[in-house]
Amino acid sequence: MGGISIWQLLIIAVIIVLLFGTKKLRGVGSDLGSAVKGFKKAISEDEPAKEAKKDADFVPQNLEKKEAETVEKQKQNDKEQA
């Protein structure tokens, strides 16, 4: 009906095993698995660096707000004293 049936996939798998052999297929599978594992590890190591950058962005803004509040308080105190 236009789609690939399970029997066709099974026949293709048998032909691939006969052509390449099980040792080469195991080697390719393990290489592919280690590549995926390395990719996932690299992605997970990259995410904390992005979070650290976000945290670093918030710290200076808070300091600027505190400094601005301190300056405003000093101005109010100066006005009250004068």
Curated annotation (Swiss-Prot):
Location in the cell: Cell inner membrane
The keyword rRNA-binding belongs to this UniProt entry's keyword annotation: no
Membrane topology: Single-pass membrane protein
Region span, Disordered: 48-82
GO cellular component, one term: TAT protein transport complex
Domain of life: Bacteria
Keywords: Cell inner membrane, Cell membrane, Membrane, Protein transport, Translocation, Transmembrane, Transmembrane helix, Transport
Main location: membrane
Pfam families, A to Z: TatA_B_E (PF02416)
Subunit text: The Tat system comprises two distinct complexes: a TatABC complex, containing multiple copies of TatA, TatB and TatC subunits, and a separate TatA complex, containing only TatA subunits. Substrates initially bind to the TatABC complex, which probably triggers association of the separate TatA complex to form the active translocon.
PANTHER family: SEC-INDEPENDENT PROTEIN TRANSLOCASE PROTEIN TATA (PTHR42982:SF1)
UniProt-recorded name of the protein: Sec-independent protein translocase protein TatA
